[in-house]
From Swiss-Prot:
CDD domains, sorted: F-box_AtFBL13-like (cd22160)
InterPro entries attached to this UniProt entry: F-box-like_dom_sf, F-box_AtFBL13-like, F-box_dom, FBD, FBL13/AtMIF1-like, LRR_dom_sf, LRR_FXL15/At3g58940/PEG3-like
Residue ranges of every copy of the F-box domain listed in the record: 1-53
SUPFAM superfamilies: F-box domain, L domain-like
Gene source species: Arabidopsis thaliana
Superkingdom of the source species: Eukaryota
Name by which UniProt lists this protein: Probable FBD-associated F-box protein At1g32375
Length: 422
C-alpha cells in the first residue's frame, strides 16, 4: 500500500476511475492521503447491486457521496439501477447535482430482471440541465412530455435502448434540439408508444435503428430518415414495417441492411455510394431501383437465410464492378417455407468476377446442389481470385471431407486461387 500511495496523484485518480463508486469511496480509510483523493475521480459508477450498509439505502449513499464529490469536470456519471426502488425524485436530484460538475457523459441503465414491473420515469430536468453533455445513454426507462424546450447544444452521442415515449412528437423535439449530434442508437421495445420514429438530423454520421419482431404489434410502425451527412447505417427490422428515406444518403460508406420490408428500393437506392455492405432482405425482385450501380462497393456480405438470396447475390454482383471481397453467411434460420430458388446461371459474367473479386468466404456452407453450382460458377469465372475459404455447417468429418474433395476438383480460372476449408 505504501508503494501504491507513492504514485502520482493523477495516476491514482485514473486507477480509481475504473472502480465502482462504492469501492472508490471505501479507499478513504487507507490513509490520510486517500481520505480526499476519491473526491477527485472524474468517473463515477453507481451500481445498486452494491449495497453500502454504512450509508443506509442506496439512494442515501449516492446522495452523500455525490454531494462530497469535488472534481471540477465530471467525465462520466453512470447509474446501474433496478435492484432498489430509486424513483424519479432521486434521479432528478442526482442530475441537478451533476450539472454543477460540467457533466460530459450520462448513462442510466435500468435492469428490470430483478425488480417489479414498475417503470422508472426520468425527470423533465434531464432535458435542460446538462448543457455540457456530450454523451447520453438511456436504457429501459420512460421519457415524459416536455413542458419546455430541450437543450442539448453539445450532445454528440445519443443511445435510446428499450425506451418508452409519450408519442411521436417527443422524438422530433428531442432530435431537433441536438444540433451537433453525430451518433444515434435506437433499439425499440414493445409498446414504446411510437408509430413513426422520425430521424431528421443534418449532422448525423452514424445511425443504428433496430426493431425486433416483437417491438410492435402495429404493422403501420416504421422509420422516417433524413440524414444527409450519414456515413454509417445499421438498420434491422424483423417486423416488416416501413422505412421512408426523404433524401439520398450519398456519404454512406458502410451499411447493414437486415429487414423484412416488402419494399426496399428506396432504402437500398439511397446508399449506392456504400463501400462495405451487409444485406439480408426477403426479396431480390426490385430490391433496389433498376439502373442503380454500386460503383464504390468493395466488400459485400449476403445472408443466405432468405429464399431469394441467390438471385439477390447475382443482381448485386452484376451492379458492383469494383467488388473485391464477397462473404456468404447464414445468420438466421430459414425465414420462409417456400421452395428454394433454382440456380440459373447468368447469361453474362459480372464484371467484378472478371476484373476485381479477390476473396470469397462462405460461412455455414451446406453443400447443397445450388450452393455447389454457385461456388463452381464463381471459381470458373473469377479471374482475380486469390483465396476461397469455406466453413461447413456440418460436424460430420466424412461429410466435410467430401465437400472439400468436391470443391477442390472444381475448375479455377485464376491460377493463384487457393481453397481453404475451415
Amino acid at each position: 500500500m505504501d508503494k501504491l500511495s507513492q504514485l502520482p496523484e493523477a495516476l491514482l485518480v485514473r486507477i480509481l476511475s475504473l472502480l465502482s463508486a462504492k469501492d472508490v469511496v471505501s479507499t478513504m480509510v487507507l490513509s490520510k492521503r486517500w481520505q480526499f483523493l476519491w473526491m477527485l475521480v472524474p468517473k463515477l459508477i453507481y451500481d445498486d447491486s452494491y449495497q453500502a450498509i454504512e450509508y443506509g439505502s442506496f439512494s442515501r449513499f449516492v446522495d452523500r457521496s455525490f454531494t462530497l464529490h469535488d472534481a471540477q469536470v465530471l467525465d462520466t456519471l453512470h447509474f446501474k439501477l433496478g435492484k432498489t426502488s430509486c424513483g424519479t425524485g432521486d434521479i432528478r436530484v442526482w442530475i441537478k447535482t451533476a450539472e454543477k460538475s460540467c457533466l460530459r457523459e450520462l448513462i442510466i441503465e435500468i435492469d428490470k430482471s430483478n425488480s417489479d414491473n414498475s417503470s422508472v420515469v426520468l425527470p423533465r430536468s434531464l432535458y435542460t440541465c446538462c448543457r455540457m453533455l456530450v454523451t447520453l445513454k438511456l436504457n429501459n426507462a420512460v421519457l415524459v412530455d416536455a413542458t419546455s424546450s430541450f437543450s442539448f447544444p453539445s450532445l454528440k452521442t445519443l443511445s435510446l435502448v428499450s425506451m418508452k415515449f409519450p408519442g411521436d412528437e417527443l422524438i422530433k423535439m428531442l432530435l431537433s434540439n441536438c444540433p451537433v449530434l453525430e451518433d444515434l442508437v435506437v433499439k425499440r421495445c414493445p409498446y414504446d408508444n411510437v408509430t413513426t420514429f422520425t430521424v431528421r438530423v443534418s449532422s448525423l454520421k452514424c445511425l443504428v435503428l433496430h426493431e425486433t419482431e416483437l417491438a410492435s404489434i402495429n404493422a403501420d410502425c416504421g422509420f422516417v430518415i433524413d440524414t444527409p451527412s450519414l456515413e454509417c447505417l445499421d438498420i434491422e427490422d424483423g417486423r416488416g414495417g416501413f422505412c421512408v428515406i426523404e433524401n439520398n444518403m450519398t456519404k454512406v460508406v458502410k451499411a447493414n441492411v437486415c429487414n423484412s420490408y416488402v419494399h426496399t428500393q428506396q432504402l437500398m437506392g439511397s446508399i449506392s455510394s456504400v463501400k462495405r455492405l451487409y444485406v439480408c432482405i426477403p426479396s431480390s425482385k426490385d430490391a433496389y431501383p433498376v439502373g442503380s450501380v454500386f460503383h464504390c462497393l468493395v466488400r459485400l456480405t449476403i445472408c443466405t437465410c432468405e429464399t431469394e438470396w441467390l438471385n439477390l447475390l447475382m443482381c448485386v454482383l452484376r451492379d458492383s464492378p469494383k467488388l473485391r471481397e464477397l462473404k456468404l453467411v447464414k445468420n438466421h434460420v430459414y425465414r420462409s417455407h417456400q421452395p428454394r430458388p433454382c440456380w440459373n446461371e447468368p447469361s453474362a459474367v459480372p464484371e467484378c468476377l472478371l476484373t476485381s473479386l479477390e476473396t470469397l468466404e462462405w460461412v455455414k456452407y451446406e453443400g447443397t446442389e445450388e450452393e455447389k453450382e454457385v461456388a463452381a460458377f464463381i471459381l470458373r469465372s473469377g479471374s482475380c481470385l486469390k483465396k476461397v475459404t469455406i466453413s461447413s455447417k456440418s460436424t460430420d468429418i466424412n461429410k466435410k471431407f467430401e465437400m472439400l474433395k468436391e470443391l477442390s476438383l472444381l475448375f479455377r480460372r485464376s491460377p493463384t486461387c487457393q481453397i481453404a476449408f475451415d
